[in-house]
Each structure stands twice: as C-alpha cells, then as structure tokens.
C-alpha cells in the first residue's frame, strides 16, 4: 500500500472499493480497447502504473486490448541514426527508410517494453502487429495541405480488420499489445495512426469501451478555457465541435466518433498523466476525463 493510500481514512477506502462493484460486474467478461500514448508511455512511473492497471483488469475478468503508437520514440531514433524526418499535414512523411525505423521502434522497442512491464505481474501480455495473422489491412492515405492533396509516403488507414488473432489471445486470457503496422492488399507495409487503429479494432471486437489516453484532462468545448471541460458529450454535439478542436486532438475525437457510431457503447478521452487513470475511469462513478456516447 502506498503512503498516499495509507493516509486515507478507512471509511474512504471502503467507499472507493464498494463503488467499484457495479462497474466490475458490468465489465466482467467484456473487451476494453485502450489507446496507449502520450506521457503515459514516456514517464517511468506512469508506464509502470499503466502496466499494473492492465494486469488488474485481467485479474478482474475484464479483457484489455492495448493499441500503442510511438511517435516520440520514432523521432528520437531517426535523429540518433541521422535520418531526416518531415511532417506534412500533421503526419510523418514515411519513406521506406523511415518505415524500417518505425517497425523497429514500434514492435521492437515500445511494444517490447510494455509487454515486459505487464508481464512483471504475470505471464499475461503478448505483442503483435497489424502484420500478424492479417490483423489489419491498410490502404494508403494522403493529406490535404493548403488545399493540395499531398503524398506522405507509406502511411495508411485501416481498410479491414481480421480480429481472429486478437480473439484467440483473449480466449487464452492474454493481453494483446498491438503495434500499428499493417500491409496493404499488395503486401506493402504501412504505418497507421494508432488512434485510427484503436477505433477500428474496438469496432471489430465489439468492445464495451474505447479509452484514449491523452496529455490533457479531457475534451474542452472552448480551449483554453479550462472551465469548458465536459464530462460527457454525445456524438452529434461532438461532430459539430470537431472543426474547432486543437489539431492534436482531432484524430482522437475522430476515433471516438468512429467507434461509438459503429456500436461501441462509449469512448473515453482521459488524462494519461494521472497514475492509474484507467482504473479511475472504469471503476468510479465520477470517472475522469470525457465520455463520448451515441446521440
């Protein structure tokens, strides 16, 4: 028990634990897809807390599926190797050389580190990529920059999901840790935005929830007015709000809209800078961050 919990009165501890019961019952046996990113995957304390949360969910009979990116780590490795990097329209221009680095970093570094952190709690996590068992099929995408359609190289969207491999891991009570690399129909591998991939996977798995870890407290209807933080919003309202959001938040909101519109009961934008934010969101009445529901 940490010093922070030791300082709490016994009655408060009891109330928190009792409050979790209906949520534990509701989520038992259900799939929860978590997009892991931001400070939660670069700060050592937060990384360990996230891994513990995944083990906690698994031991409560809930099925977590983790989808991760690795933008900062890819940038650092490109710099270390002396490979120039460029961004257009908010996306990394991905040459074959850059893709080789992305594959090495996403699956060989970021994914491995998270798998090992989770497995410190037991033999739970298994790392896979969208290349494994045809999990994802990619389709190449472009971006619009100043009104001009612009090629950004080997960057894709998810065209199809074959969830069989992930479902097999879930049936074996493993925790899938998914790196978002995927081949197109011709076998050419692309890097896929992790927010997009998480939403597509949540839809294909029939997940109960999609959680998006960010570096903000949730969704603000009028940023930077911190009083505009909303605890719940429906898809119709959020769709209207989308054009006004900060650029970095748009892919996350689009992912939430896609998942909920496809039948996932709720998507949640939560603050990954808070230790055990996943547990707070799932097992307390007030939760944390912003919950997105169908209109």
From Swiss-Prot:
Keywords: Amino-acid biosynthesis, Arginine biosynthesis, ATP-binding, Cytoplasm, Kinase, Nucleotide-binding, Transferase
Pathway named in the protein's UniProt entry: Amino-acid biosynthesis; L-arginine biosynthesis; N(2)-acetyl-L-ornithine from L-glutamate: step 2/4
Top-level enzyme category: transferase
UniProt-annotated site: Transition state stabilizer, residues: 35, 252
Matches recorded under SUPFAM superfamilies: Carbamate kinase-like
Cellular component GO terms, alphabetical: cytoplasm
Pfam families in alphabetical order: AA_kinase
InterPro entries the record matches: AceGlu_kinase-like_sf, AcgluKinase_fam, ArgB, Asp/Glu/Uridylate_kinase, Glu/AcGlu_kinase, NAGK-C
A molecular function GO annotation: ATP binding
Chain residues that bind substrate: 70-71, 92, 191
Any Gene Ontology biological process: arginine biosynthetic process via ornithine
Reactions this protein catalyses: N-acetyl-L-glutamate + ATP = N-acetyl-L-glutamyl 5-phosphate + ADP
Domain of life: Bacteria
EC number: 2.7.2.8
Cellular localization per UniProt: Cytoplasm
HAMAP family to which the protein is assigned, alphabetical: ArgB
Function text: Catalyzes the ATP-dependent phosphorylation of N-acetyl-L-glutamate.
Family affiliation: Belongs to the acetylglutamate kinase family. ArgB subfamily.
NCBIfam families: argB
Protein name as annotated: Acetylglutamate kinase
Organism for this UniProt entry: Mycobacterium avium (strain 104)
């Amino acid at each position: 028990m940490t010093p922070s919990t030791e300082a709490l009165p016994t009655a408060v501890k009891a109330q928190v634990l009792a409050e979790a019961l209906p949520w534990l019952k509701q989520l038992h046996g259900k799939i929860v897809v978590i997009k892991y990113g931001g400070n939660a995957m670069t700060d050592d304390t937060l990384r360990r807390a996230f891994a513990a949360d995944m083990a906690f969910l698994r031991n409560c009979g809930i099925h977590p599926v983790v989808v991760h990116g690795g933008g900062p780590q890819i940038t650092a490795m490109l710099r270390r190797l002396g490979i120039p990097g460029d961004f257009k329209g908010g996306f990394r221009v991905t040459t074959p050389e850059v893709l080789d680095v992305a594959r090495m970093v996403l699956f060989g570094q970021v994914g491995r580190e998270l798998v090992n952190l989770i497995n410190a709690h037991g033999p739970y996590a298994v790392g896979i990529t969208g290349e494994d068992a045809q999990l994802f099929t990619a389709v190449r995408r472009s971006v619009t920059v100043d009104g001009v359609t612009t090629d950004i190289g080997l960057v894709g969207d998810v065209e199809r999901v074959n969830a069989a491999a992930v479902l097999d891991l879930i049936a074996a009570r493993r925790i899938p840790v998914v790196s978002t690399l995927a081949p197109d129909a011709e076998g050419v591998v692309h890097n896929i935005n992790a927010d997009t991939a998480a939403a597509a996977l949540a839809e294909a798995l029939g997940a109960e929830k999609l959680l998006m870890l960010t570096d903000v407290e949730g969704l603000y209807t009028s940023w930077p007015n911190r009083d505009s933080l909303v605890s719940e919003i429906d898809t119709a309202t959020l769709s209207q709000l989308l054009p006004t959001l900060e650029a970095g938040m748009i892919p996350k909101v689009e992912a939430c809209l896609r998942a909920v519109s496809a039948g996932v009961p709720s998507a949640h934008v939560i603050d990954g800078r808070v230790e055990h934010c996943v547990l707070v969101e799932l097992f307390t009445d007030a939760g944390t961050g912003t919950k997105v529901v169908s209109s």
